Amino acid sequence: MKKITFLSLFIATTFFCQTNTEVHVFDIIKTEKGYDLKNGINISNNAGYDSQPYFYDDNNVLFASTRNKNTDIIIYNLKTNTKRFISDTPNGGEFSPQRIPKSNDISAVRLDDDGLQRFYQYDFKSEINKEIIPDLKVAYPSWFDKNTMIAVAIVHDSLELFLCDLKKKTNFSIAKNIGRSVHRIPNTNLMSFISKENKDSWLLKSLNPENKEIKTITSLKLQEDVTWLPNETLLISRDNYIYKFDPEKDKTPSLFFSSADDNINNISRIAVNSDGTKLALVAEVSPEYLAQEQFEGYNKRNINAFLKPYAKDVKVYRFPNNLEYEGLENMRTRYEGFFKNTADLHCELIKRIVHKNQVIDHELVTANGKTRKAVAIYTTENGKIVSVTFM
């Protein structure tokens, strides 16, 4: 039981940290100067975690999406703008969906509520699912061919890269201290992965699965998420930007995409379809969205809706920096009774200022027959409100 408990905490905090994110898809337009991303749409539109996009084909996108407090797999059709769940796991959830080569089936990591983690193949037609690679706790898979997988797996308290032969049922350890981003390099027989052996500067490396040869491609500093265009140009996400880098031509990365959308913040996962015409990205919702979510929960006196956008270790200050209390449960204790016992509670928003990851609300608060002015400063990180300062 100690191992299960530790592993569950490790997975929850390291691999599947469920922030409030959305999946967006753009058209990639080639121009004389390079590329433009146009016609962006939010294909998830869901409160909670939506992430890990993968192009099933050029017109369908798989991704993991939260519903009923669990995470299932959605497939979104870009032609019809429709989506449907293709998994339904009441006592757990699925992550890291991918299409299995030369098959209509998909693979996904299944994480049960009790901490049990397995890697499954899902058959669309028969709805029969079977476990594959039972000897590894696969976290981030990437298919090389239908019989070969490069898998990032959990070993003790870190991530390790394995070359898995499904026919021979062998798993060969390749490297330790690995990042989550593993991809096939277009037009080659190579896979790329991120080595985190150097804590100050992570390296993007290539692996030849046939002879296990490893070479360094470039330094990524401390960037976690990458993908490839069909012409072997590397894309790297960082903050609200995506950068491009041609390992054969470029000395340094250059700007590929800069978001002007307030609802695209801290871009993480990125994926490109096979013909290079579509790009999917995962981004956090805007700080204003989080402030508005708790604002509406407050006026409804709904304690769960009010607390939802707050981080577990949220800190509450009195201006300028006097800590009053911290922790979500402390916040629940303070507000739950207040909501129940204050029938006339209402907050009116007078003015809102949004600056980077902060929201400043000027409010009129009515409670117990009295109305007063208030100012609240909300600071957000990783899709959650991490601190509130009252003036």
Go through the PLM ranges and name each one.
Residues R332-M391:
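A beta-strand edge to alpha-helix "cap/lid" segment located at domain peripheries
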Residues I303-R352:
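A solvent-exposed, acidic/Ser-Thr-rich amphipathic alpha-helical stretch
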Residues M1-N20:
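Bacterial Sec-dependent N-terminal signal peptides
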Residues S65, R110, A283, Y310, ...:
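Short beta-strand segments enriched in hydrophobic/aromatic residues
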Residues Q18-Y289:
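Sequence signature of WD/YWTD-type beta-propeller architectures
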Residues S286-N302, P309:
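Short, aromatic-enriched amphipathic alpha-helices that serve as compact interaction elements
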